Amino acid sequence: MNDDLNALEAHAIAVIRDAHRLFAPVCALWSMGKDSTAMLWLMRKAFVGEIPVPVVQLDTGMELPEVYAFRDRLARAWSLDLRVEACPPEDAADPTLPPQSRAAARKTEGLRALLARDGYRAALVGIRRDEQATRAKERVVSPRAMDGAWSVREQPPEFWGYSLTDVPHGGHVRVHPLLAWTELDVWRYTRRESIPIVPLYLARDGLRYRSLGEKNITVPIASDAASIDAVIAELESTREPERAGRTMDHESEASFERLRSGGYM
């Protein structure tokens, strides 16, 4: 198992370094969840204890209080160049989307404004293929149009470790260092490396958050897993999907693909 984690770590660090070398200026998106926090940890390893790019939180104002407290604490501890990008109100999102997806689409609009204003050519994002069916169609380096749109039918091939090395004219690329990781990989790596996490991931009074999102579209699951060891043991036996607590994911699969096609993470 340690060999598997070492291989995943080495690949992720190589992807991060390549992105910084090929696509500057680069930013890193941080939701404060376990995956993007693990990505920041890997970036610190890649650059000898520092993160040499801005770390961006797309802020809807709807995160749980514990998540904001974690953000502020870790930003100080790791000396992050944290940029908090306020997302536009929900009525700026596509009105034809279902209600929960429309709430999530605020982050798409916030990211679009950020990229247009600050000129980033690449954004590092901590998504994984196994967490959602539409994300399973992604690439490690994913080209985006000028408006951030993603075409699932026009993804570049990635054979034998080859990834895209050019940025589309007027567009940007999303770089996904954790794409091949699983939920269990992230938790095992978090345990091995003692990476900080939001306490809400651990059970209290029979409930915990398996996936963290905005408080208006995320609910906790029933669980007694009050430690990372217990979370790993729980995941080794569960058949429930990771995002079962995300109300957005109970809308149609087509809704999430529309969100991602429009530029959502």
Label for each model-derived stretch:
Residues 1-265:
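Nucleotide-activated chemistry modules centered on ATP-dependent adenylation/adenylyltransferase
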